[in-house]
């Protein structure tokens, strides 16, 4: 592929930034040479009840993986996100809520949020929820979900937020794993004009006899829709709030006590309950939010994620609120009621920072200029990308069309397990290359290793590992530390293995090439699926592409590409040939697709992740081995892809 262009830091950005190039270099150097000194200083950004004396106590030795930060200090996360802001910014907006329906919105100040959190914390105590108990939150994107999270943190309960798109079976599995005592939900969720039967899903989940740990369901009224009611088990959120006291002293928590569990899919077996603790996580979420997004007091910050994912935890709730920011909470989807929704929300609420996913960017890009029709966009100062590698074509469209070539893009790489951003540009310090996550954040020491675990120097490609701990790192998998060690520390000993492949260029910039299990081996050549997808999407007629490997008699693996075309483009054999030649030209003959299947849509979770597992099964004709597809945003897409695949096989028979 052609050399990536470098977009230097704009002088006006460098002049006003929190972190210019010299500051980045000095801070990064200190953070890796003297992590104790660096993090001791950075930890002062939050309020401690009992100051810590110990900073970093960590071991990546696979016989004794142990991660502790600020272990003898005490604090309360809820107090750091609310109480400490009341004097200075009690009347500032903490949350701007934008409903699925554009006519619905709510503004909540820090003082109001503090009162609601205190009331609900008392309500939870009244339901026998205490320090160390697990509370499952299965809610739509409404302010009450944030209230529930902060109320748990206030009393020392551990929250487990389960994305509202998950099926009753998936919900039950997560409740069983953490032995949840209370489930907080809503009558229904609303998303993209459709209703989701959340309470009914909870009822179904609890028919599993192994969910007997659950004593109460607290139900928030979102739509007023009809729901089944269990007299001695179910309680209305609103009834609890009416009688609860608005005074609730925050519980003093040890820095290494659990704050939350968040379940993420394992490549095999049951979901992994990623465990994050209190002190290090909050320090890291707050620092990364401030420095990566160059956040200034009074700005409106919008992360489009759902609180059911780690991005919502760290960059809608904890990071922004710890920093006293105004955070926008969006219930809906980027294309409802139409594709201009994102740009309309930006203008309506004068959003300064927009942090979204490549899948949303590509959806807007497929509609071209129509996505920003009538938009002003002048409030925007910074753009961000999260969730998967962003292909250069989408990056350029985002930069030019949404950011008007004046907003830097922070292309962030991190994981549920990392707690916060690990590799990203800093707007005032880092020149940008479309598609590259660029350089490590403070305290993060990335490296590339070969399949034997040997470190690779210079410009190279390999397995991405992190050589030392950082405060936001997950401490374990809930109830299964052995699996934590096996998953992250056994593959390459003494290192945290991310599961991702990456390329490092001659400038030391990192390019994420995709999950290692998404790496193709074609005739002995390693190729990341992201690289081929980026080449395909760079074609003017392609909106989206997903690449999977299929068995090939000669090459070992063949390249199978699902392609979604831009609006108004007709599929044809001629276009199929054109796209194959295009990829040959962009990457080389070795990357030429063996099969291109037209796809009106791709199977995605509601957070926008493409489910490549399903695409692999369809490509190899394993239609009966697709597993649970209930968590997909549009399960109907799957049958369409199966039908198309069958028709292609018939045509070639």
From Swiss-Prot:
Query: What's its catalytic activity?
Result: acetate + ATP + CoA = acetyl-CoA + AMP + diphosphate
PROSITE patterns assigned: AMP_BINDING
**Which InterPro entries does its entry note?**
Ac_CoA_lig, ACAS_N, AMP-bd_C, AMP-bd_C_sf, AMP-binding_CS, AMP-dep_synth/lig_dom, ANL_N_sf
GO molecular function, a single term: ATP binding
Q: Could you tell me the EC number(s) of this protein?
A: 6.2.1.1
* Assigned keywords, A-Z: Acetylation, ATP-binding, Ligase, Magnesium, Metal-binding, Nucleotide-binding
The UniProt record gives the binding positions of CoA as 191-194, 311, 335, 523, 584
Q: Which domain of life is it from?
A: Bacteria
Cite the binding residues for ATP: 387-389, 411-416, 500, 515, 526
Residues with the N6-acetyllysine modification: 609
Q: Which GO terms describe its biological process?
A: acetyl-CoA biosynthetic process from acetate
Which cofactors are named for this entry? Mg(2+)
Record-listed Mg(2+) binding positions: 537, 539, 542
Q: May I have one GO cellular component term?
A: cytosol
Q: PTM comment for this protein?
A: Acetylated. Deacetylation by the SIR2-homolog deacetylase activates the enzyme.
> What's a Pfam family in this record?
AMP-binding_C
This chain's function reads:
Catalyzes the conversion of acetate into acetyl-CoA (AcCoA), an essential intermediate at the junction of anabolic and catabolic pathways. AcsA undergoes a two-step reaction. In the first half reaction, AcsA combines acetate with ATP to form acetyl-adenylate (AcAMP) intermediate. In the second half reaction, it can then transfer the acetyl group from AcAMP to the sulfhydryl group of CoA, forming the product AcCoA.
Family the entry assigns: Belongs to the ATP-dependent AMP-binding enzyme family.
**UniProt-recorded name of the protein:** Acetyl-coenzyme A synthetase 1
Look up and give the organism this protein is from: Pseudomonas putida (strain ATCC 47054 / DSM 6125 / CFBP 8728 / NCIMB 11950 / KT2440)
